[in-house]
Amino acid sequence: INGLEQSDAYSADKENLASFKLFTGKKSLSEILKIYNDEIASKGIKPASGGHIGYIPGGGIYSSAISDFLVDVTNEFVGMNFSCPGGVAIEHVLLDWMKDVFSFPKTAVGNLTSGGSIANLIAMTAARDKYQIKNEAISKSVIYLSHQVHHCIQKALKIIGLEDVIINYLELDDYSKINIDSLKLKIKI
């Protein structure tokens, strides 16, 4: 943990599947932690590394890790008020604060998710439902994306039953932003 800031942001090493083989014996905590370090924590993307700037996960933020630990140990379910009124209250306070930060109306609603994939799934579901995209309207509906779109968007489309929409890919400008002229042209067609 002390070396996270200087650690590599990515390791291309492949997993050792034999480490995950199911068996009926026992392993000590130190053996399990070694497997975790060797096969989980040291391979692939290292979001807690000081060199990783791809997105903003929980990363190496100590207070965030302790919060996750506490919730996991006490097995809190903050998905509804009945099961964890305090956890739901914290979510509402944070959402109200975010509404103020972004000048959203007091009537705006939302939720805190585990990450961007679920956030995009919720947003696409909300858009589908708001515009009542169902049945024969699906194959006539158009979504505009760039080739730099996150892979979770295509997964979300499939999950919510919109895999048959028309997808128009837009060009990007020199700053990797969607080219507005390209968007306007595609919408006119």
Give the label of every model feature segment.
Residues 114, 137-141, 145-189:
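PLP-dependent aminotransferase-class I/II
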Residues 74-82, 104-111, 137-140, 165-171:
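Glycine- and acidic
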Residues 83-87, 110-117, 145-147:
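Active-site nucleophile and cofactor-binding loops and adjacent substrate-binding regions
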Residues 50-53, 114-115, 122, 175:
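Short glycine-rich loop/turn motifs that provide flexible caps or phosphate-binding loops at active sites
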Residues 1-107:
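N-terminal entrance/gating region of PLP-dependent enzymes' catalytic architecture
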Residues 59-63, 120-121, 155, 177-180:
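Short, solvent-exposed polar/charged micro-motifs at secondary-structure junctions
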Residues 91, 95-96, 107-136, 153-156:
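Conserved beta-loop-alpha segment that forms the PLP phosphate-binding cup at the N-terminus of a helix
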Residues 35, 39, 93, 97-101, ...:
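Generic, well-ordered alpha-helical scaffold segments in large soluble proteins
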